[in-house]
Amino acid sequence: MTDTLKPRDAKDVENAVQWALAESKALEVVGRGSKRALGRPGQTDVTLDLSGLSGVTLYEPEELVLSARAGTSMTEIEALVASKNQQLEFEPMDYGPLLGQPDGAGSLGGAIAANLAGPRRIKSGAARDHFLGVSAVSGRGETFKSGGRVVKNVTGYDLCKVLAGSWGTLAAMTDITIKTLPRAETEETVLLLGLDDVRAIRAMSAAMASSCDVSGAAHLPAHIAFRFGGLESTQATTALRLEGVAPSVKHRKETLIALLQSYGSVTSLGAERSRLLWSSIRDVRPFAANGPSGQRPVWRVSTVPSKGAEFATMIPPSAQMFYDWAGGLIW
C-alpha cells in the first residue's frame, strides 16, 4: 500500500519533495484524487496529497483575476465566481461522473494539471490559456514562481504554459492564479436533426466558419442522442451553441438557421435546456460509470475536425460514441 503525505502549506510540500529526492522515492502528486482512474496506474512509492492546501486567497472580479491554493475545490471556485456573474471561460469538465466519483470532486490544481477544457474550447481555449501565475515546487525540491496576478504580464518565460497539461510530472503546484470572465447573459442552441456523421461535420465546419460566433459544436448520433440532458430526440442531433446578450443571440440564431437550412430539419433550444445539454456533453454524462454504460472502457480521441467522421469508421459498430469540438474530439 502506498504511503501518503498530506502537507499543510507550501513549505511542507517543499520538504516532502526534498525528502523524496533524498530517499529516491517516486511521488504521485494528487489534488483531490478525482482523476486517478484515468490511464494506467502510476508506479509510485508515495502519494503527495495536496487537498490540505485549500482556499481562495485573492479574488478581484473587477480585475478578472482569482488566486487559490492548488487543492481548492472547483465547486467552491465556480460558486464564488458565479456569485459575481462571472465564469471560468475554459468550461472545465467534471470527470467525477465519468470515473465513478461524486460530482464536483476535482481541485483547481487538477484542472490546471490536466489542462481541462469543455465544449467552449473551440472558441476560448483550454485551462492553459487562462492560467496566469503559479507558485510550485520543482523535482529538485526548489520553490519557484512564474507569471503574476495580472491578465497581461511580462515576467519572463511563461512556465505556466508548460505546467498546464503536465499531470503533476514537472512540479507540485501550491498556489495558482487564473483569469475569470463575465458570464454570458443568455444562450440558445440550434439543432440539426437526422444528419449522418459526414454531413454533420460539414455543417459544424460551416457554422464555425460563419460570423455567428459559435461557442459549442457537437454531433450526437441517434443511438445515444436521447441520453443527453435537455434533449428528447431519437434522431441524430447536431448541436450549435450561441452565447451572449439576448439581442445578439437572437440575431445570430436567425443567421445560423438561414445558413444551415439546406442541411435539413432545424430547431432550437432555449437557455435552460441549452445549459442542461452542454453540461451533459461537457461531463460525458451518457458514459457515467454509474449509468447505463457502466464500467466499460472509455476512449477520448483528439483528431483533426475534418477527419472525425473518417476516424469513426474504424471504431467497432458495437461501440457508442459522439463528437465534440466540431468533430475534433471523439468520446
Please provide the spans of the model-predicted regions.
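Short Gly/Ser/Thr- and Asp/Glu-enriched loop/turn motifs at secondary-structure junctions
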Residues: Q43, S233-Q235, Y323-L329
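A short linear hydrophobic-aromatic micro-motif
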Residues: A26, D213-A218, S318-F322
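C-terminal substrate-binding/cap subdomain adjacent to the FAD-binding core in PCMH-type
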Residues: A113, L132-A288
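Glycine-rich beta-strand-to-loop/alpha-helix junction loops that act as flexible
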Residues: V29-K35
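Short, conserved charged micro-motifs
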Residues: N15, T75-I77, D197-R202, A246-E254, ...
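Short glycine-biased active-site loop of nucleotidyltransferases that positions the nucleotide triphosphate
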Residues: R36-G42, G229-L231
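N-terminal glycine-rich flavin-associated loop
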Residues: M1-L27, L50-P102, I112, L116-R149, ...
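Substrate-recognition/cap regions that form aromatic- and gly/pro-loop-enriched pockets
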Residues: I281-W331
